[in-house]
Amino acid sequence: MFVFTKNLFTTKFSSSLLNWRFLRTMADSLVDINERITSQGNLVRSLKSQGASKEDIDKEVAKLLQLKNLKLGGSEVSGKKKDTSFTLKTPKGTKDWCDKDVVLREHIFSTVTEIFKRHGGVTLDTPVFELKEILSGKYGEDSKLIYDLKDQGGELCSLRYDLTVPFARWLAMNPKVTSIKRFHIAKVYRRDQPAMTKGRMREFYQCDFDIAGNYDPMIPDSEALKVLVEALDALEVGNYTIKLNHRKILDGIFTVCGVPDDKIRTISSAVDKLDKLPWEDVRREMVVEKGLKEEVADKIKEYVLLKGDRSLLDKLEADSLLSSNSSAVAAFNDMRLLFDYLEAFGVLDRFSFDMSLARGLDYYTGIIYEAVTEASAPKIKSSAEKKKSADPEADRSNDDSIGVGSIAAGGRYDNLVGMFAAKKNAKIPCVGISLGLERIFSILRSKIPDEDIRANDVDVFVMAFGGGKEWTGFLKERMSVCKDLWANGIKAEFLYKVKPKPRQQFDAADKFDVPFAVILGQDEFAKGSVRIKQMGLKENSDEGQLVPREEMVSVLKKLLKYD
């Protein structure tokens, strides 16, 4: 007996010691991994701040992700999984939509959809992910923001970055479609620095309207911009300006200033930052990071800081250098037509001819534009200001240098379809607009009082009042009344209790600001009548209107203005 107990004790002690050593090793390993994650994260941030190449940054980011996966998965050496706890939350740059936010979002959807259809738009839906090669090489420096999906032994795929490239891919796959007005409202994904309260997210909706086909110059472009103006006016985003430019004017400027052909796109991306950074910072990026000669950068400055109305076009045409560039001259002709057509549509006063607008996406070939509001424009940082944290995972909602950004943008892309088409000459010219739902939402949500948004569309709450031993609660009667209201297109609810108290029913109706109540009084209902009461008034100020049961629907429709 003693030997058995001793062996049992020895066995338990040895096992406990081994477990303690294992846990100690695991703890030490976890500390080591945390230190390595911190060190690797600092290295990635350092490379980004130094303007290192994308290949070098991606290589170190991959190492950082491996370390994070190792931490979550536990020790690979032991082959055992670590029991980890985590904070229940949505991923950075995403959110759950509920309650009044959903109501406002649906209002934006329905508003722009009605306008898109008014102009002849038809719906197109494409997969949320595309083959990786479809998206590669279409977004310039922003390609680093594409989410690549992990290879599962099949096709290499990426989450869509926008709705434009998938549309062009669809056109290339359907050669019989040579013209179309298409709209698409769907989610896109970008690994950007999030600022949640300002609508800068990693998963967000775009509302796109595009016109594809061979038409006379600038006619579809002007209608696309007319659609944009109608949408922003209908949404009541406040005072806004749509900045206009032409890709060929920019190309002409870069050429006459002496920018090498292989640097034109990267210098264009630098110029596009002038809405957020002072010229000194943009110039430094051009010269120090991108190797442009200082005198070339100074020449560019003379052009890209220009902005104004259509009279700016006369000034540019009078420039001897630009007027000798065929690309710029062709763009001048386009702009003159566009200004005339926008004037015909009655929207010319909404536009600013802004030479700093470049749009970083590689697929634009002609007119480009971007809509900003007073609420969406970021504060331009002075070069003396200290830089904020470069952590790409940080939410930058409280960074006053980050605005909502452009609330809509777009342009002409004549060559994108041809990149995918089997025939080399299969080109379908396209022009389109894209509204950023979350950015518009953040502006509207800050302007509209909470009490002005109803989270529920119910117009009538069916109640029952009574008492005494014979009182049943009128559950089946309330169900029957709701059935009649639903059958006549009236949105109605009742409380899921057999014998609800009056206060419970009023509270349920008040929770969603239901405008009317249909009250089944114990005695009145027995006589074939119901009481229709307007809600939201002072207590006891209105007893309601007693109407025959058979007239209930017609009376409610008049009160609700359904007819």
Curated annotation (Swiss-Prot):
Keyword terms, alphabetized: Aminoacyl-tRNA synthetase, ATP-binding, Cytoplasm, Ligase, Mitochondrion, Nucleotide-binding, Phosphoprotein, Protein biosynthesis, Transit peptide
Keyword Nuclease listed: no
Catalytically driven reaction(s): tRNA(His) + L-histidine + ATP = L-histidyl-tRNA(His) + AMP + diphosphate + H(+)
Biased composition (Basic and acidic residues): 382-399
Subcellular location: Mitochondrion; Cytoplasm
Residues carrying Phosphothreonine: T90
EC number: 6.1.1.21
GO biological process: cytoplasmic translation; histidyl-tRNA aminoacylation; mitochondrial translation
Coiled coil feature spans: none
Main location: mitochondrion
GO molecular function: ATP binding; histidine-tRNA ligase activity; RNA binding
CDD domains named in the record: HisRS-like_core (cd00773), HisRS_anticodon (cd00859), WHEPGMRS_RNA (cd01200)
Gene3D superfamilies: Anticodon-binding domain, Bira Bifunctional Protein, Domain 2, S15/NS1, RNA-binding
Record region (Disordered): 381-401
InterPro entries reported for this sequence: aa-tRNA-synth_II, aa-tRNA-synth_II/BPL/LPL, Anticodon-bd, Anticodon-bd_dom_sf, His-tRNA-ligase, HisRS-like_core, HisRS_anticodon, uS15_NS1_RNA-bd_sf
GO cellular component: cytosol; mitochondrial matrix; mitochondrion
Record carries keyword Ligase: yes
Transit sequence range: 1-25
Domain WHEP-TRS as annotated: residue spans: 29-85
Family to which the UniProt record says this protein belongs: Belongs to the class-II aminoacyl-tRNA synthetase family.
Known role: Catalyzes the aminoacylation of histidyl-tRNA in both the cytoplasm and the mitochondrion.
Protein name, entry field: Histidine--tRNA ligase, mitochondrial
Provenance organism: Schizosaccharomyces pombe (strain 972 / ATCC 24843)
